[in-house]
Swiss-Prot record:
Metallothioneins have a high content of cysteine residues that bind various heavy metals. The keyword Nucleus does not apply. It comes from Trifolium repens. This is Metallothionein-like protein 2. Belongs to the metallothionein superfamily. Type 15 family.
Length: 77
């Protein structure tokens, strides 16, 4: 997870989340717990499931944080 200005990580939909409290170059093995609520409504027609993504971005192939807590380049999916 990348850091912007040492206080936030690049989240989903190219928006910055609160993924980290500071830029640490070494591996940080601290425990983080998050909950995700999923609601699936099934009807008579075709079913469509929608899942909310967690606010995390990968360094390669995901978001990279630029200046002022903005994502650069914006390549989130």
């Amino acid at each position: 997870m990348s850091c912007c200005g040492g206080n936030c990580g690049c989240g989903s939909a190219c928006k910055c989340g609160n993924g980290c409290g500071g830029c640490k170059m070494n591996a940080d093995l601290s425990y983080t717990e998050s909950t995700t609520t999923e609601t699936i409504v099934m009807g008579v027609g075709s079913a469509k499931a929608q899942f909310e993504g967690a606010e995390m971005g990968a360094e390669s192939g995901g978001c990279k944080c630029g200046a002022n807590c903005t994502c650069d380049p914006c390549t989130c999916k």
